[in-house]
Amino acid sequence: MVVEKRNPIPVKEAIQRIVNQQSSMPAITVALEKSLNHILAEDIVATYDIPRFDKSPYDGFAIRSVDSQGASGQNRIEFKVIDHIGAGSVSDKLVGDHEAVRIMTGAQIPNGADAVVMFEQTIELEDTFTIRKPFSKNENISLKGEETKTGDVVLKKGQVINPGAIAVLATYGYAEVKVIKQPSVAVIATGSELLDVNDVLEDGKIRNSNGPMIRALAEKLGLEVGIYKTQKDDLDSGIQVVKEAMEKHDIVITTGGVSVGDFDYLPEIYKAVKAEVLFNKVAMRPGSVTTVAFVDGKYLFGLSGNPSACFTGFELFVKPAVKHMCGALEVFPQIIKATLMEDFTKANPFTRFIRAKATLTSAGATVVPSGFNKSGAVVAIAHANCMVMLPGGSRGFKAGHTVDIILTESDAAEEELLL
């Protein structure tokens, strides 16, 4: 078999080539309760102000601020309570000279009142109370439209729907939401050395860990996943299963078969399905032979058969492709700074991604490699919540150095930071 020529490109360029392709999913309508993690297909515009009316942020008394002027410890001013309202109720009383309405949090400010006195700022009697300080106009009042005004864009097209966005959608009465349909993914593990999870181990064989891992990563994004039977190193059957997967899915992910060995058929498979290879080598470790192709609006990802390299390839390349297909506003991985807490002395001719454990402390983020960090490592992935990104050309890093990390999980808070 002819060895395919491979010219490594930088990670950022590889991602850019992926998101430069013309690929998009159609808009669909889903129930609000099913919209979590989808991408909005349209701007959401405020149809009324928030708050809708002047309201009280506290339990207390609504008064006229002018009546409180001159109040002090030596000159307490008395008010007469003329009404009592809770959230959802509206007083029909007009607050007059030295009058007040007992008001609960969230209730609409009654006519005539322009300030709220909290209960703890008063001395109450049966139907009166006194205060010892003056209040200014609009003090302790949440004003109509102070957060959002009619016509404001409150959620943008391309925004990920998180729980906060669901609260906004519910506020404006969206029982159904127009979103971008999420792509479906086919996962195909390849290699004659692979056994299924429930198979008995044999000499020279390993269980297929990449297939279940990729499925979990895709489902974590909310994607529909199709799992195909583990493929042996056979070109004809490989071509057939990839063609079948392309007919049913928007993204096809294969693991294994991307190196330069005698049984790595992926280049021939891409040729058979007439896919354009966007790149077949990336200047990074692990996963340098990650290959991505594109045809008819669909992506084909050839990820390494080594688990850590496979995981890295999904995080760096599959995730941005999914976001791009869904029209997300942000597609590139988010990078934050962290302090390396252990030496990592291995030289890095290419950009190196290390599975690691990050912790967010009051002094900033810290990070520790999560164990054995060769490309074939499995256990280190389970104990990692980020990847450390070490630039190519470096000769290793010492504890105390500032490094770039990409969070892959959100459980990075130190216990002492929790309330």
Curated annotation (Swiss-Prot):
State the needed cofactors, names only: Mg(2+)
Keyword hit for Methyltransferase: no
Q: Which CDD domains match?
A: MoeA
Q: Which GO terms describe its molecular function?
A: metal ion binding; molybdopterin molybdotransferase activity
Highest rank taxon of the organism? Bacteria
Q: Pathway membership of this protein?
A: Cofactor biosynthesis; molybdopterin biosynthesis
Question: So what does this thing catalyse?
Answer: adenylyl-molybdopterin + molybdate = Mo-molybdopterin + AMP + H(+)
Query: Which UniProt keywords are given for this protein, alphabetically ordered?
Result: Magnesium, Metal-binding, Molybdenum, Molybdenum cofactor biosynthesis, Transferase
Kindly give the Pfam families that the UniProt entry links to this protein. MoCF_biosynth, MoeA_C, MoeA_N
Please tell me one Gene Ontology term that the record gives under cellular component: cytosol
EC number per UniProt: 2.10.1.1
Q: Give the InterPro entries listed for this entry.
A: MoaB/Mog-like_dom_sf, MoaB/Mog_dom, MoeA-like, MoeA_C_domain_IV, MoeA_C_domain_IV_sf, MoeA_linker/N, MoeA_linker/N_sf
Cofactor binding annotation: Binds 1 Mg(2+) ion per subunit.
Q: Which GO terms describe its biological process?
A: Mo-molybdopterin cofactor biosynthetic process
Q: Which PANTHER family match?
A: GEPHYRIN, MOLYBDOPTERIN BIOSYNTHESIS PROTEIN
Family indicated by similarity: Belongs to the MoeA family.
Stated role: Catalyzes the insertion of molybdate into adenylated molybdopterin with the concomitant release of AMP.
Q: Kindly provide the name given to this protein in its UniProt entry.
A: Molybdopterin molybdenumtransferase
Q: Look up and give the organism this protein is from.
A: Staphylococcus aureus (strain COL)
Per the UniProt record, the lineage of the source organism begins with: Bacteria, Bacillati, Bacillota, Bacilli, Bacillales
